[in-house]
């Protein structure tokens, strides 16, 4: 093969989505070291959760792969925050770890438009004609019009087990030794980040009777609407740390490479190691931990919330201080990994390098944390790389479109001083960009971008035509002088209750009934959110000159610190600062209003 439209470097979650998206346009090469590691879940065996499931639903709506893989290998599904409103409800799918990777490999390796190329990227060279050559360590020069670098935690990766380190991108896998150099020489500022993973414990050595069992939802949910047949087969469990856990950690902090100063990389604020939790939250006498199976008939469980870089002999002692783990045997020890990332403010909103036109980056190389964030970036980078290689018009997914737009906007305009994790609190107007309406919002966009087929778009259009027919049926029929939608707006009424009164509805699937119910019950709130969205365009131009940020108690601690440091001159500038969230902007607007009223009186 003399060349490709796009070469994707890396077979993790970002690389998979990039190759999948780019292959919808033209032929793609996926450059990987070991095919057996493609699609691997190196950390938790699950997809979704608050802020993250919304990304997966949006990736699915845009023709992506992750939601499909998660559903096909699901062993446990749960809607989190189910008792709260739809704006913050999130699906979490527990997966069969090995099956997820195997299914990903089946899909990618079986795709006629994706060529699998084995090797390690050593350099990126311009071909002098607007394209690129990916030079491998064995001297091959692979030609492409565009390149997506999705190197994960592998660029100059180092793993840490206590004070001992190894050159690895993750456990047992060699790092990418040379790829940082061409990025740095082009002008990219490289930073060192750190993340970690918990230990895996032999399941037959755990006393599950001492743990709190968390069953799967009886009616399984999926990202595609079709979770696999095993989606309710396995529970998860909950345990917690003890005072003895905390005592051991405090007494052995000198064994931690982070606290000893060996690790330079910045770790994730919202997913701290167990050492960090004990030190930063010393006033807590316990920390909750979740025990997740690696599969239905697994020999291992994953100890969510217990990531660590302490040495193996200490991990053995620590795990045995947990209820139910008194006889625990660790099969794979926890470790930390330190790696290079680019400064994401040096990218465009399509994740293209500002210094290397035609080179895109996606996933943890951009300073993010998590499978879902990586997949979302991979889809965008793969799509944009393919469109660029074909000379198609550049398309930008804006902040207002949903969680994916917020992710891109935050990375490019705010950047991050630590691994970035998507959360619902980062997103303005969450009621407008829920997980349940991702297809309605984004599938038409996916069709325009070339990511979604006419047939897929037609199915979504038909779905919401049926929802609209249901709404019209509610509005048309009256019981006891009130229309069906008026009855449904009552807090104590669900759609089934309205039907029990005698209101007749067309046949609707479960997800269509849910969409109809949300549309009716939250109509007033949704209209208000739309009006607020319009008014905020004006509010963002307001001046912050002379505002004493340190004196505004209602701001979050992080926002107060960042605002005082950066001294933004307008609300829009404040909103672009890493660590300043939508709630903080609301606090600033209230403060400005109070100042104006005070001056006027």
Swiss-Prot record:
Keyword entries, A-Z: Cytoplasm, FAD, Flavoprotein, NAD, tRNA processing
SS bonds (residue pairs): none
Single GO cellular component term: cytosol
GO MF assignments: flavin adenine dinucleotide binding
Amino-acid positions noted as binding NAD(+) in the UniProt annotation, renumbered to this chain: 267-281
Intracellular or extracellular location(s): Cytoplasm
Region (Disordered): 216-242
Domain of life assignment: Bacteria
Residues holding FAD: 10-15
Example GO biological process: tRNA wobble uridine modification
Compositional bias segments (type: Polar residues): 233-242
PANTHER family linked to this entry: GLUCOSE INHIBITED DIVISION PROTEIN A, PROTEIN MTO1 HOMOLOG, MITOCHONDRIAL
Similarity field: Belongs to the MnmG family.
Protein name in the entry: tRNA uridine 5-carboxymethylaminomethyl modification enzyme MnmG
High-level lineage: Bacteria, Thermotogati, Deinococcota, Deinococci, Deinococcales
């Amino acid at each position: 093969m003399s060349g490709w439209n796009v070469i994707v470097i890396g077979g993790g979650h970002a690389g998979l989505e990039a190759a999948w998206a780019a292959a919808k346009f033209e032929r793609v090469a996926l450059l990987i070291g070991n095919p057996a590691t493609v699609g691997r879940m190196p950390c938790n065996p699950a997809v979704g959760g608050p802020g993250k499931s919304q990304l997966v639903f949006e990736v699915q709506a845009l023709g992506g792969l992750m939601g499909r893989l998660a559903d096909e290998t699901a062993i446990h599904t749960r809607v989190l925050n189910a008792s709260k409103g739809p704006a913050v409800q999130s699906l979490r799918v527990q997966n069969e770890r090995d099956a997820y990777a195997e299914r990903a490999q089946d899909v990618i390796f079986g795709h006629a438009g994706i060529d699998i190329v084995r090797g390690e990227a050593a350099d990126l060279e311009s071909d002098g004609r607007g394209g690129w050559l990916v030079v491998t360590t064995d001297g091959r020069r692979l030609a492409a019009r565009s390149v997506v670098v999705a190197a994960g935690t592998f660029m100059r990766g180092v793993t840490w087990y206590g004070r001992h380190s190894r050159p690895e991108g993750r456990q047992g896998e060699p790092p990418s030794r040379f790829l940082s150099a061409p990025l740095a020489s082009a002008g990219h500022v490289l930073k060192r980040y750190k993340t970690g993973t918990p230990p895996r414990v032999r399941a037959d050595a755990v006393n599950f009777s001492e743990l709190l069992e968390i069953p799967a939802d009886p009616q399984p949910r999926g990202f595609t609407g079709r979770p696999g047949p095993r989606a309710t087969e396995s529970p998860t469990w909950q345990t917690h740390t003890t005072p003895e856990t905390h005592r051991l950690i405090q007494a052995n902090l000198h064994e931690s490479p982070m606290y000893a100063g060996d690790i330079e990389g910045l770790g994730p604020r919202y997913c701290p190691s167990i050492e960090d939790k004990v030190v930063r939250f010393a006033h807590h006498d316990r920390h909750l931990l979740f025990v997740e199976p690696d599969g239905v008939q697994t020999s291992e469980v994953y100890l969510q919330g217990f990531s660590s870089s302490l040495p193996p002999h200490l991990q053995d002692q620590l795990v045995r201080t947990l209820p139910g783990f008194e006889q625990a045997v660790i099969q794979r020890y926890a470790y930390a990994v330190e790696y290079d990332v680019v400064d994401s403010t040096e990218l465009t909103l399509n994740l293209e390098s500002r210094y290397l036109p035609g080179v895109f980056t996606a996933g943890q190389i951009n300073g993010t944390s998590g499978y879902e964030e990586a997949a979302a970036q991979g889809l965008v980078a793969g799509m944009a790389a393919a469109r660029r290689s074909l000379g198609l018009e550049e398309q930008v997914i804006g902040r207002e479109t949903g969680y994916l737009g917020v992710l891109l906007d935050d990375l490019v305009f705010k950047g991050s001083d630590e691994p970035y994790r998507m959360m619902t609190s980062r997103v303005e107007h969450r009621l407008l960009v829920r997980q349940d309406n991702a297809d309605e919002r984004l599938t038409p966009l996916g069709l325009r971008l070339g990511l979604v087929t006419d047939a897929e778009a037609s199915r979504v259009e038909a779905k919401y035509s049926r929802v609209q027919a249901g709404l019209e049926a509610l509005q048309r029929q009256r019981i006891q002088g009130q229309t069906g939608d008026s009855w449904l707006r009552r807090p104590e009424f669900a759609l089934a209750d309205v039907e029990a009164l005698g209101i007749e509805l067309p046949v609707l699937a479960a997800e269509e009934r849910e969409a109809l119910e949300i549309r009716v019950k939250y109509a007033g709130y949704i209209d208000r959110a739309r009006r607020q969205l319009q008014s905020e365009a004006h509010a963002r131009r307001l001046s912050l000159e002379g505002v004493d940020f340190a004196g505004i108690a209602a701001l979050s601690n992080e926002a107060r610190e960042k605002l005082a440091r950066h001294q933004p001159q307008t609300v829009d500038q404040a909103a672009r600062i890493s660590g300043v969230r939508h709630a903080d902007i609301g606090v600033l607007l209230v403060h400005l209003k109070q100042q104006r009223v005070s001056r006027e009186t």
